[in-house]
Amino acid sequence: MSKQQIGVIGLAVMGKNLALNIESRGFSVSVYNRSSSKTEEFLQEAKGKNVVGTYSIEEFVQSLETPRKILLMVKAGTATDATIQSLLPHLEKDDILIDGGNTYYKDTQRRNKELAESGIHFIGTGVSGGEEGALKGPSIMPGGQKEAHELVKPILEAISAKVDGEPCTTYIGPDGAGHYVKMVHNGIEYGDMQLISESYFILKQVLGLSADELHEVFAEWNKGELDSYLIEITADIFTKKDEETGKPLVDVILDKAGQKGTGKWTSQSALDLGVPLPIITESVFARFISAMKEERVKASGLLSGPEVKPVTENKEELIEAVRKALFMSKICSYAQGFAQMKAASEEYNWDLKYGEIAMIFRGGCIIRAAFLQKIKEAYDREPELDNLLLDSYFKNIVESYQGALRQVISLAVAQGVPVPSFSSALAYYDSYRTAVLPANLIQAQRDYFGAHTYERTDKEGIFHTEWMK
């Protein structure tokens, strides 16, 4: 019997859909799932396709041509380690494991090192696009040994999303680079979603827009600079009616946002690297505070503040101001995310190509947006650009739109409407463009109570003052 070209372990939604995607591009596939009933179920769905079901790890490994290419689609963490351990006795030198799960990049770095000692290649691969993307074409971010990537590259390119005929996948860098970039992608996604939700809140609470009007506004925004998957689906969300009440479905959804922790990982890494990531971090905190529903309801009856009074005049001008505020904040958020990737690349010697990363984000993934082309062009102009805000294209926009962001935040603050990520974006912009910040006082305080020393503006050296004298 001929051997299959690639194997997939794990037949939950993402694994199943990736297996079908791979087969649809002309590759033969073996599958294995810990529970055989899942395998049977999948084989029924894949009837007539070039897919072989296996019922033990040994049978699965033996069904594959060498060097074996195995895609792991199991739960991140201990389940991935357990699966790798069960595979190892059956693998041979130069076999390739591809981890397509939502894995923490430090776990990928560890596994890469451990498996290299056994002669096994390990490719930690970020996959974005959800259930539909897995089936029709996701954005794929592989990291690991470059020579191993060359062997799986034809498969990854074939199954990825395409934009202008270009595959939305590229070699990201060594060891944990692929999963790191996917993690930052998810952090940017948190920022995008929070900024959109704050825009919605202002339009609904302060401007009093109905669901139908909100649909029209977001659909119109999606035709211009904000053209993106998240704006597109937001416009669609406002058209959906609840079958039970007849109300817009969004109005009966509980305001408690869930999360899987990847936004938190992004913020933790930024803290470790000493990189400012306020918008994304504020977006993570916003989800935390949203989860405190009972406490917030109690506080709403005890703590006073401005009463929201819908604005009735100059609505069109204010809607345009919110659009500009959203786009400027989005630029600041991406600037922070790409600056974090730059810091990580320098820390871990990954040599990330930021323009290429922007290009593969254009299709298949959740943050896909037209303006990613502009990010790519910015890095074409200056491959080692310190911050996107310093690129001429983005500099001109933020300078032009900052007035709108200030106006929208002022309006929200006056009405008592929380806009933590908008406020964070403006504070970041103002801090970044300020040559002299009040950190001199912080250094004086640190030296006062802890003798932590300080530097001076007028001469070289490290200084300490006896403040109590």
From Swiss-Prot:
Could you tell me what reaction this enzyme catalyses? 6-phospho-D-gluconate + NADP(+) = D-ribulose 5-phosphate + CO2 + NADPH
Enzyme Commission identifier(s): 1.1.1.44
> Domain of life, per the record?
Bacteria
Residues annotated as binding NADP(+) are G10, L11, A12, V13, M14, G15, N33, R34, S35, V74, K75, A76, N102
Pfam families xrefs = 6PGD, NAD_binding_2
Alphabetical list of InterPro entries matching this protein: 6-PGluconate_DH-like_C_sf (IPR008927), 6PGD_dom2 (IPR013328), 6PGDH_C (IPR006114), 6PGDH_Gnd/GntZ (IPR006113), 6PGDH_NADP-bd (IPR006115), 6PGdom_BS (IPR006184), NAD(P)-bd_dom_sf (IPR036291), Pgluconate_DH (IPR006183)
Question: What is the enzyme's class at the highest EC level?
Answer: oxidoreductase
Q: Which GO terms describe its biological process?
A: D-gluconate metabolic process; organic acid catabolic process; pentose-phosphate shunt, oxidative branch
| Catalytic residue positions | K182, E189
Q: What does this protein do?
A: Catalyzes the oxidative decarboxylation of 6-phosphogluconate to ribulose 5-phosphate and CO(2), with concomitant reduction of NADP to NADPH. Is the predominant 6-P-gluconate dehydrogenase isoenzyme in B.subtilis during growth on glucose and gluconate.
Assembly and oligomerization: Homodimer.
Q: What is this protein called?
A: 6-phosphogluconate dehydrogenase, NADP(+)-dependent, decarboxylating
The species this protein belongs to is Bacillus subtilis (strain 168)
What taxonomic lineage is listed for the species of origin?
A: Bacteria, Bacillati, Bacillota, Bacilli, Bacillales
